[in-house]
Amino acid sequence: MKTILFLCIENSCRSQIAEAFAKAYSCSANKIISAGSNPSGEVNPTAIKLMGKMGHNISDHSSKSVNEIKEEIDILISMGCGDSCPQLSAKKRLEWDIPDPKKMKEDEFVEVIKLIDKKVKKFIENLPES
């Protein structure tokens, strides 16, 4: 079992979307979580709406602080927060430079969701089982 953390600044859009896709594509043995370095306290309503239209209900997700993460992280994926993301201990770190969609128009927001979907799917497909 691997613990995979998706990390962004507010844990309201990108990391929430990535968590949902990873849970959909990954085997249940993996623990998939997301958090933010400065959480907003809520999941972005546009993210909830658009993910719902794509068949992924994230309305029950919550915006969490990275300080709440107690698990040992096997793989940390930063969603593009650069220096704003804390240097957490992880066996492997990946940096995905995903634009923050929170102020984008819906059609642009959808393109970011599709980008995250594509990256997560490829990541999960190439994830070793052990």
Model-derived regions, located:
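Alpha-helix boundary/capping detector
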Residues: 48, 76-78, 119
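Hydrophobic/aromatic beta-strand patches that form the interior of the parallel beta-sheet core
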Residues: 33, 75-77, 94-96
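Short conserved AdoMet
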Residues: 27, 71, 128
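Conserved active-site segments centered on acidic
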Residues: 1-67
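Surface-exposed loop/turn and secondary-structure junction residues enriched for glycine/proline
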Residues: 20, 24, 69-72, 91, ...
